């Protein structure tokens, strides 16, 4: 396994790089997570999507629903984890990989640890709240009894472009409303 460090150019963040032996599968499943993000966008939610895979099959899908449900915990990862637990009839999601378009926040990273997900793959880095390497890494806290493996930056530009376009549109709509008042 090859590893080194690099500086993520947009944020000046030092990240660990290692060879991803699952890249083809990771790209395939991240495209499925992007489809979920587009569902969120279609209902005017922040476009974040998630799929959970076990034995090369999607067992759960989720996308952001905070505005729709008015629930602060209705993040894509939480929605998918709840569905996966129900489908497998267990809270232990051992042997599962979670794919999400944006780096998990503290709440979602905690839920991933608590549900014993084996591996996490995310697309876009979150410089304001990412807790799997950008702001901090909850997966590497030694006192925790579970430490998921993780890969970052898979289809990063596609995932971050979805978010950038969404928020650009929101800002434009806000400007248009303030001009018309």
How should these model regions be labeled?
Residues 7-11, 17-43, 91, 104-181:
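Zinc-dependent deaminase
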Residues 48-56:
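Short beta-strand scaffold segments in enzyme catalytic cores
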Residues 73-74, 78-113:
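Helix-adjacent hinge/juxtasegments
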Residues 44-48, 94:
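Short, basic and Ser/Thr-rich N-terminal targeting/leader segments
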Residues 66-68:
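A short acidic/small-residue loop/turn micro-motif
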